[in-house]
Amino acid sequence: MKFRAICENHLYQKAYSKGKRQVTNAVAVYVLPDYAAKRLARSHPERRVTNRIGLTVSTKLGSAVVRSRIRRILREGLRSLEKELSLKQGFLIVIAARGAALSMKSTEIREELRVAFRKLGMIQEP
């Protein structure tokens, strides 16, 4: 499943400053309600509201090859987590990689994401 990306810098800044934050060893997750998506849902109820995702990996973590690898692992961890769990929709989600992500396996990063989303209250209970 392809994610809708956050493309505007001001949305990243808003998520960093006003969003809820959960930090683990490998990732920092910022979550903010996407008011534009909720406004769109009210005007077009037939459309499905989804989350918009932003991934950030600092240049401090390594070369472009290393940063791209971490980005791919984060994307795959989020994709498999969405298949397994039901995440709440209509949010801006920014995932920032941290230094410990370099030495972790993809399953470990996936578990870190699961812990962060659970603590943020993003997992829908059936």
Where are these regions (language model features)?
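Positively charged, solvent-exposed patches that mediate nucleic-acid binding
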Residues: 1-126
